[in-house]
Structures are given as C-alpha cells and as structure tokens.
Amino acid sequence: MIKEILKKADEKMGKSIVALKRELASMKAGRANPAMLDRIDAEYYGSMTPLNQLANISVPEARVLLIQPWDKSSMGAIEKAILKSDLGLNPSNDGTVIRLVIPELTEETRKNIVKTVKKTGEETKVAIRSIRRDCNDDVKNLKKDDVSEDDIKKTEDDIQKKTDKYIKEIDSIISAKEKEILSI
C-alpha cells in the first residue's frame, strides 16, 4: 500500500511537470514554435478541431511558422482562429500555405510574459503541494490498517523529498524559460 501511494505521488507530480512544460512551450518567446498553436481550435465542418489536426505546421525560419492545411477549404477557418487567438499574430495566406511571422518582442512584452511564466510556475507548485497533501492524507489513513508509526513517518518523509525534487525542477524550468524570453 505504501509503495502504491509513493508511485501515485510520483505519477501525479510528473504529470504536473509535463503539463507545465506544455503550457510554457505555447508561450511565445520571440521564436517560432509549433506548440504556440496547440491551444488554437478552428471550426471545421461544424466542429472545433485543433489546428495540428487540420494542417502540417513547420518552422522554415527562426521566426516564421508555416501552416500547410491538408484541406485547402479550411484555410479561412484556420486564419480566423489565429486572428481570434490571444497570440496577436497576423496570418498571411498565399492560397496554398499560411505564414505566421513572429514579431520581435518589446521589453514590456517580455516582462509581461515573464510574469505569466512565474504565475504558471507558482500554480504548478501549488498543484504539487496539493498532491503531497492528498498522499499524506492517504498515508495517515494507513494507521487504521495497522501500519507502524515509523513506516508512516518514513513514507511522509519520502513524499516530502519527492515534493522538494519536483519543486526544484519547476524552479529550473521557470528559470530557463525566463532566460529564453529575456535574451535578445
């Protein structure tokens, strides 16, 4: 039972880190990255469909995204979805592909993105601590199953070590993203 609790803590904390990385990848840092478009859905035959299911997205240059729709009739919907998104990008359509030029970031924009990155990191830390609390509650419930106090204390310490490890990893991910955004 103790091993299952530790495994559950590890899995959930790991998923939080993966979600953080995915979220940060979608934030623009002055460089083109197909993950920027992950949260954009376009209306396609009456239903909202993720952009990466409607087109091939590539990076031909450092600051250019090239979107090649598999169905040319979806180009208008893709353009409209990009314009409606909070990315602030202007698509240019040449009839076969859509180009997105990522503009240089101003200092003010960079600082705002860094604030958002830090906020996202803090939210992930809160999620990790919440997982720790839930797992510690599960461990405390083991007292009813005749598990020794020493085993319970050791398990709680192990959970805390995992928490500390993941919090440190979050800090390094956030720090790296800040450097990426602030470097000109």
UniProtKB/Swiss-Prot annotation:
Chief subcellular location: cytoplasm
Domain of life: Bacteria
Gene Ontology terms for molecular function: ribosomal large subunit binding
GO BP, sorted A to Z: translational termination
Cited InterPro entries: Ribosome_recyc_fac, Ribosome_recyc_fac_dom, RRF_sf
Family annotation (CDD domains): RRF
Keyword terms of this UniProt record: Cytoplasm, Protein biosynthesis
Subcellular location: Cytoplasm
Example of a GO cellular component annotation carried by this entry: cytoplasm
Function: Responsible for the release of ribosomes from messenger RNA at the termination of protein biosynthesis. May increase the efficiency of translation by recycling ribosomes from one round of translation to another.
Family: Belongs to the RRF family.
Name of the protein this chain belongs to: Ribosome-recycling factor
Biological source species: Clostridium botulinum (strain Loch Maree / Type A3)
Source lineage: Bacteria, Bacillati, Bacillota, Clostridia, Eubacteriales
